Amino acid sequence: GATLSGGVNASSITYATPTGSGTDISGQLDLVAGVASSPAQGTSAEAAAAAVAAFANMSNDWYGLYFAASSVLADADVLAVAGYIEGAGVSRIYGHTTQNPLALDQTSSADIASQLKTLGYKRTFVQFSSSNPYAAASIFGRAFTVNFQGSNTTLTIKFKQEPGVAPETLTVSQAAALKAKNCNVFVRYNNNTSIVQEGVMANGYFFDEVHGTDWLQNDVQTAVWNALYTAPKIPQTDPGVDVLLTTVDSRLAQAVTNGLVAPGVWNAAGFGALNQGDTLPKGYYSYAPSVDTQAQADREARKAPVIQSAIKLAGAIHFSDVIINVNR
């Protein structure tokens, strides 16, 4: 075979050379000078964030990111990758496992979970595991089994299991420290069960809501694209805009079917005919102004009026108080 030189630094692949024993077949394999291609010089190992950027530049056809490196990434690399994922134009999620015991210390702010929380990243999550450096990958494995085109298929990450990951036995103060830092953990309870808690991103957003709304964003984009792609043309008229509104609403209806969205009260600022405090009986509402109100530049650019949708997330129950009144 070829001689490989180097190690962590740049390597190169050159011509085959005899080992000094056995039969030299390098000539038969055309691996010798004058026949084989010129030696190929390698490159030094790239930084983690640069590798992610290269993948992103190559393809948009991926969503979850986890480093299965033989050694744990340095905190600086984790922060660089998290920053890239947070600011990228394509929605993705990055997971990281920490084994640093400082994550269990309520007084520490130097651990990676604390640093990511301070930065307020909603597209990165951290899990503490003392035994498994790849524990957070199990959260990806569970979450990405969801088929959003089904009925009642969405789930919350809390209360789930992590096959192959040993549960942690924590003190009350250690559990409180992880929760305060928005650091997930697979933990053993004294009722002989083990669960993932709390199922959150670094900024405290729930994993399932970020995952679910990312799916919805992609699903609506795909549906609107297909409507434009398959029609001979959609006219730049109010009936034409209604075609797009119907397309959007069909995907919002699927979000109700799979359990991401549900009827409820809209508690944010209103738009169109929707006011704050109104009930969304379907769980969603979509609105687009008349094309008559468009700026001439937008009309000449063949843009549709902006379509706005309001959705009420179904959420999930994680805690419950039960009051029992007793009468003798």
Name these PLM-found stretches.
Residues 4, 18-20, 44, 51-54, ...:
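Generic structural signal for short, flexible, solvent-exposed coil/loop and linker residues
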Residues 1-134, 266, 270-272, 278-284, ...:
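Polar low-complexity, Ser/Thr/Gly/Ala/Asp/Asn-rich disordered segments used for subunit assembly
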Residues 196-328:
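Structured, hydrophobic secondary-structure cores that serve as assembly/anchoring elements
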